[in-house]
Amino acid sequence: MWRESPERQQPLRTGLTTGTCATACALAAARLLLTGKSCDECEVTLPKGRKVRLPIAECRRLDVYSAYAATVKDAGDDPDVTHGAQVFVIASLGTGAGEVRFSAADGVGTVTRDGLSLAVGEPAINPTPRRMIREHLLELADECAYNGAFDVAVGVENGAALAQKTMNPRLGIVGGLSILGTTGIVRPFSCSAYIASIHQGVDVARANGYDHIAACTGNASEDYARRHYDLPDMALIEMGDFAGALLKYLRRSPLRRLTIVGGFGKISKLACGHLDLHSKASEIDLDFIADAAGSLGATPNTLAAMRAANTSIEALRLAGDLPLGDLICRRAWEKAAYTMHNSMQLEVVAIDRQGLPVGAYAGEDL
């Protein structure tokens, strides 16, 4: 694991991205080829200028022109799917002055759909890691008076299996993981990778001709959207609890139509104005739900029972035939429309635990 950073006094420990790991491995392997010197530690410079040292688990020649180096990914205290995975690089010397060419080794995926920051057919090594690797290798080449090219194949042990726990299959990245990172540092529980995958999902849908997407809070809502709207998986966005991340992105980069589908409790949180729907960030407000029922004519006894309910669904059922679900969806629609602040067609649907609709609102103009 990488030597503890100055942040070690904080409760949560930062980690390093797969892009930083790949950079260290590429540099270690290339240095072995150009100088004959192996290493058990490698220093790299992050995009903002900070230097970090990574342990190199293995560094060896494969032949005269190629070498292998590997490190173990340390995500710090972040629950990263790649934490503990071995990232490796096979670096080779080639022809072409100043060129650095990239390919995917085992465990790194390939882009198969438009809309991402990489062209179709490219290995899923994102732009910042590519730039980091290129800059470090060209600096090494200058130090060693090397005028040729580098071919860099990046891989992750067991990456194909790990990728099934990520958004890569939905985004059209097949065969493995993506090599990620914009700062080189993993911030614990920052959720930046998940939010980035939401944005990428929107971009992929747009690039492939889908102008209607359904943002879903979970599996049941996704199943409902798939059945009810006949949308392909590419147009289904796993929003989860990050309503704000999606809505603010669509404010900057709109589509024609958005449908939000979620459990009634999650939709009630959005109706309250919460853009982070996770239980750690926002709570279901039974008073808010009861007040909405009161505006529809619920009796005092019903309102008292709703305020004392164990769950939002129980409160909804206590409202009986009152169109409470529709009203909560309308309030959520208003918050979402205000956040997007554009002319996108918008619909909000709330479902129960069985995946059945309990409320909907699509705006008076739709």
Swiss-Prot record:
| EC number in record | 2.1.1.195
Has keyword Methyltransferase?
A: yes
Catalytically driven reaction(s): Co-precorrin-5B + S-adenosyl-L-methionine = Co-precorrin-6A + S-adenosyl-L-homocysteine
BP GO annotations:
anaerobic cobalamin biosynthetic process; methylation
Q: Which UniProt keywords apply?
A: Cobalamin biosynthesis, Methyltransferase, S-adenosyl-L-methionine, Transferase
Q: Name one Pfam family in it.
A: CbiD
GO MF terms, alphabetically ordered: cobalt-precorrin-5B C1-methyltransferase activity
Q: In which pathway does it act?
A: Cofactor biosynthesis; adenosylcobalamin biosynthesis; cob(II)yrinate a,c-diamide from sirohydrochlorin (anaerobic route): step 6/10
Belongs to which family? Belongs to the CbiD family.
Cross-referenced PANTHER family, in alphabetical order? COBALT-PRECORRIN-5B C(1)-METHYLTRANSFERASE (PTHR35863:SF1)
The entry's protein name is Cobalt-precorrin-5B C(1)-methyltransferase
Source organism (scientific name): Hahella chejuensis (strain KCTC 2396)
* Gene of this entry: cbiD
